[in-house]
């Protein structure tokens, strides 16, 4: 279950240089529940038959859908003027259930995060030629995966990945 709202506008009706402003926003909410299989193994000694008995009880547990954040928000603010175009964007991604497990404390989720990106381009006086700059992950946000329980290091971090920033600067020719 969920919903999505999207709004995009170019503020052409504003006076003067402000009419080059652009704004985009997208918000998604998705809630989910799934039954995951779970087998509970029971062991006991039966004194009547003098045998060791192992029973498998198949059952389920309910949790979120794998790889699906509950909320996603994208916002970008930009400016377009003649051959210039620039955008600053923000992505918010809620935590994500990424791994199911028999033991609840071993189930894994990612941390929620926000990331900022910048994109700028300028058309040059030659037909089809432009210069561009793309900068991703300006705040150097990392991806963190956590166990729902406590790990051996007295925290619940399973994995932390650092991607850093990436910046692309170039000249593009389209013909």
Protein language model features and the residues they cover:
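Residues that define the transmembrane beta-barrel architecture of outer-membrane proteins
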Residues: 1-3, 69-73, 112-116, 163-167
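Gram-negative outer-membrane beta-barrel transporters
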Residues: 1-97
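Outer-membrane beta-barrel architecture
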Residues: 4-8, 76-78, 119-121, 134, ...
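Surface-exposed coil/turn segments at beta-strand junctions on protein surfaces, enriched
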Residues: 16, 68, 79, 109-111, ...
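Residue-level marker for the onset of beta-strands and adjacent loop->beta junctions
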Residues: 35, 73-74, 116, 129, ...
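Extracellular loop and loop/strand-boundary signature of outer-membrane beta-barrel proteins
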Residues: 58-63, 102-108, 154-159
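C-terminal beta-signal and adjacent terminal beta-strands/loops
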Residues: 92-100, 121-175
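Short, local alpha-helical segments
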Residues: 99-104, 112-117
């Amino acid at each position: 279950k969920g919903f999505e709202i999207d709004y995009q506008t170019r503020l052409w009706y504003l006076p003067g240089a402000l009419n080059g402003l652009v704004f985009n926003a997208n918000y998604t909410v998705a809630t989910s529940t799934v039954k995951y299989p779970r087998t509970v193994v029971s062991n006991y000694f039966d004194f009547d038959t003098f045998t060791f008995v192992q029973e498998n009880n198949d059952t389920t547990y309910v949790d979120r859908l794998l790889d699906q954040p509950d909320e996603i928000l994208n916002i970008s603010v930009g400016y377009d003027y003649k051959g210039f175009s620039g955008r600053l964007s923000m992505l918010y991604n809620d935590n994500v259930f990424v791994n199911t497990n028999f033991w609840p404390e071993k189930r894994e989720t990612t941390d929620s995060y926000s990331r900022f990106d910048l994109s700028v381009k300028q058309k040059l006086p030659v037909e089809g030629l432009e210069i561009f700059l793309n900068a991703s992950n300006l705040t150097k946000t990392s991806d963190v995966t956590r166990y729902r329980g406590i790990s051996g290091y007295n925290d619940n971090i399973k994995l932390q990945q650092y991607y850093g920033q990436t910046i692309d600067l170039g000249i593009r020719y389209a013909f």
